[in-house]
Amino acid sequence: MKRIHFDIETDGFYGAYWRCKDESDEAIILMIGDDPEDHMAKSGVKWLIERGVNVLTMSPAKKDYGHHNYPLERIEAAITWLKNQNINKIGIVGASTTGTLALTAASFFNEITLTIAMTPSDFIWQGFMQGKKDGCKEWPIEGESLFSYRGEALPYMPFAYKHPDYWLSLIHI
């Protein structure tokens, strides 16, 4: 499948655009998988293209598994690019953390007219990184949200993460 690739530095967002064979004014911003061109993303693209929907796959950054202060301006830049391609109907799809991103973006940008959020949170979490720290795979970043807009972190629910007394916060619930 042919695609156009986008980078944060040059285009304002990280992703790939997959155009239908036939003319369509519909597109989905698809945020599943770890990369906009991995197997999961391509599977979603194939399914949507077969149904006449153009697809813009996106992820935070190349192999970036942390989620902290993700600028909603990236979604905004993607929407602007789609509108410049004569796309009039824009949907957004995400799963887990990107499901929360899909809901948040749809609440900010009225150009999004369809939102599918698979297993999102009910609220925006504190931003986090992934790797190895304190015996954990993920850990929160102090003072950072999952998302930001216009340089400001969005309000968030903090994690109860204070090793070694993390367990104490659980018994006081």
Description of each model-found segment:
Residues 42, 46, 73-76, 80, ...:
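Amphipathic, non-transmembrane alpha-helical secondary structure
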Residues 1-23:
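N-terminal cap/lid segment of alpha/beta-hydrolase-fold proteins
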Residues 171-173:
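Conserved small/polar residues in nucleotide/adenosyl-binding loops
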Residues 25-33:
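Short beta-strand element of the alpha/beta-hydrolase
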Residues 29, 56-58, 93, 117:
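Structural recognition of the beta-strand scaffold that forms the well-ordered cores
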Residues 37, 80-154, 161-167:
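Primarily recognizes the serine-hydrolase "nucleophile elbow" in alpha/beta-hydrolase
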Residues 59-91:
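Catalytic nucleophile-loop/oxyanion-hole region of alpha/beta-hydrolase
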Residues 32-65:
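Short substrate-entry loop that stabilizes the transition state in hydrolases
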